[in-house]
Amino acid sequence: MAPPVSRRHVMKWGLASASAPALARALGVSAAAQDLGPAKGKLGVIGGRDEKVLFPGKGLPGGGQLEIRLVQSMYTSDADELEVAQRARPYDPDSWYTEWTRVAEKNDQLADGYAAEGLKVTASEHYRRAQDFYGNAVWPLPESDQRMLPGYKKMREAFDKAGQMVRPPFERVKINFEGKTLEGYFRKPGGAPAKKFPTVIAFQGADTMAENTILGGAGSYVARGMAFVAVDFPGQGGPLRLQDLHLPPDPERIVKAIVDYLETRPDVDATRIGLMGISMGGWGTPRAATAEKRIKAIWMAAGSYDLGADLFDYYPPIQERVRWIIGARDLADARRKLREYTLEGRADKIECAMLVGYGGDDRIMDPQGAYRLYQAAVNAKRQMLAGLGHPQHNVRAGGPRGERAASLQDWAMKQLRADVESS
């Protein structure tokens, strides 16, 4: 049985800093992030350290990130979120599920009441909250947990109900991927009906779902004049849970299907399509760019060169989740399969602009992998920026919103030549 933990201990563990230095040497192209305004960063100490050194506590199942996410309560003023933080028991995944489900159901019921009274805006707001909280409850659950699928469906139902109350700021899209249908969402700025927008494709992380992405991170790109498409890839969201589709070692096939779709839209400038990656997408994004040449720029938070070395081995608590995502039978099979999930021999095929974000104290993705990617992508217009690892570890990405620098979004705006006036 794990020892009791104080809030101070949780914060201390969650914010532990890695400092095993590997002094970087810029090769050919300066690593200074020239296109980021006052947020410029230079390549220096990369970091990276063994998980047992970074976090002395016992890792939890469900992707292994529960104990990390406990530190986020300090960055919210939401009453329901603070209540969950106060009530959830340390090292207890069941408590995590119970407390998030409790506030989700509360908001779901409130939304039903407001809807019955014809108060559609308020009902929509509470359905959105319910969707968010159901998502928090369900994302750590493994495929074997009987609560996983019903919880995921409740999340989707709340999301759909919110859209029935008030017209959402996005449209639903369906992508034909090799005979399978991938569902997602497209969001764009305002502007003249005939305007064509530069467009961002999101390559999400292991636990991210398109519903959260289109309502969350998409907004900062739309505000800068870019359209945004969020689709759950195989290995994510609905394709994983409802269709049993897994992430392949060549995700450029998925990105190709999305670009093919975007080229059919009259409101998309197909000559200005960018691809962003977060977490596990920090590997998939550069891998896709090695083959999909219609992508004009790529940028990553937690860039990665080799998914096996940079994630599976670096952060053992996530191994079971990775096994599920790639469709392996067991951990040994996962390790064998992951030999193909690499940019070895391919990184030099990246020819577009590339920004590699990393966090020197990132506990989930090895920052050394970001540097290996930077070193190997010799034909890209490459840049590198610190403070862009997993968001629980640094103020730029995970601190109070007023202190965060929108480094990735501003860089993308410049690379895709977006017009902020059109937003």
Where are these regions (language model features)?
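N-terminal secretory signal peptides and thylakoid transit peptides that target proteins
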Residues: 2-18
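N-terminal cap/lid segment of alpha/beta-hydrolase-fold proteins
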Residues: 153-191
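Cap/lid segment of the alpha/beta-hydrolase catalytic domain
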Residues: 199-265
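Hydrolase active-site cap/lid region
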Residues: 286-334, 352
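Short beta-strand/loop motif that positions the catalytic acidic residue
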Residues: 350, 356-358
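Short alpha-helix in the alpha/beta-hydrolase fold that links the catalytic acid
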Residues: 366-375
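Catalytic histidine-centered segment of alpha/beta-hydrolase-like enzymes
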Residues: 388-402
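Catalytic active-site module of serine/aspartate enzymes centered on a nucleophile-bearing elbow/loop
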Residues: 398-423
